[in-house]
Amino acid sequence: MSDTNNHSKNIIHRILTEQINLTSNELDTKSTKEIVNIFSEADKEPQKAVERVIPELINAIDEITARLKSKGRLFYIGAGTSGRLGVLDASECPPTFCSNPDLVQGIIAGGIPSLTRSSEHLEDVSEIAIADLKDRNFSYRDVLIGITASGRTPYVIAALNYSKSISALSISISSVPESDSTLDNDIDIRLITGPEILAGSTRLKAGTATKMALNIISTSVMIKLGKVYGNRMIDLSVSNDKLLDRAIGILFDIGSVDKDTAVRLLKKTNGSVKLSLLIALSGMDVIDAKQLLNDSKGNLRTALISFKDN
């Protein structure tokens, strides 16, 4: 009896992301084909996890959009893989949507060096998170998305606590149930993908689900901010030949202009696809088109409706 009790006391409780995945047991004995098949099957879980949190994603997108329309900014914060995913998503916003680099920012424990070299020990230093936010003048107007697969990263927990304390919008993304971790937030996104193929390696299923969620959040917010027309990136930054070709294609498809006209419009508008489209579709000159876009808060569809109504 006493031996049994002692054994029970010594049982380790593992949070979900640290538990053993029975389908990948004895992984080192599998053939290459078997390993790939195990991964292929496991990678169906991230999609299911995202589908389960659609209501939370909708809420997050609408709340973030409202904050950004009121001069707020969006910050991702995390350590290790979670931090890298946030930095990756934030860094893609300026070239994709021509957004100000300050509008969406990614913060990783340890800063830029941690993007290429592991600094996992820094995830336990709570004070650094608050300092990182203060260095960026993080305020009540802003939004913080704290990313922590385990739901237990001190760096992220401290950031969320600070965010809540100053009434900023606080959103958490984790891959464990509330029974494993309770986080201080306004919106709680739980991407439950189960135990990893490699126990504890949350760069796998948890990381994939997180990347999917961040794609949805940032892209949807930018759509709401008028950065997209139809399904085209009309606020893209024309900075290389590939993007110039894309811009010309957008003007051809939506503005119904030939290549030479598209190039002339882009030169006239300093590479602004959105402004070029408004000119092509309305016949307005640059000054009037620019004024109408400003009056329409940068939304091309709103500007076109206003032009037609007048």
Swiss-Prot record:
The active site is at E92 (proton donor), E123. Residues 64-227 form the SIS domain. Pathway: Amino-sugar metabolism; N-acetylmuramate degradation. PROSITE patterns: GCKR, SIS. Gene3D superfamilies: 1.10.8.1080, Glucose-6-phosphate isomerase like protein, domain 1. It is an enzyme of class 4 (lyase). Keywords: Carbohydrate metabolism, Lyase. Pfam families: GKRP-like_C, GKRP_SIS_N. Homodimer. A lyase-type mechanism (elimination/hydration) is suggested for the cleavage of the lactyl ether bond of MurNAc 6-phosphate, with the formation of an alpha,beta-unsaturated aldehyde intermediate with (E)-stereochemistry, followed by the syn addition of water to give product. This is N-acetylmuramic acid 6-phosphate etherase. It comes from Prochlorococcus marinus (strain NATL1A). The gene is murQ.
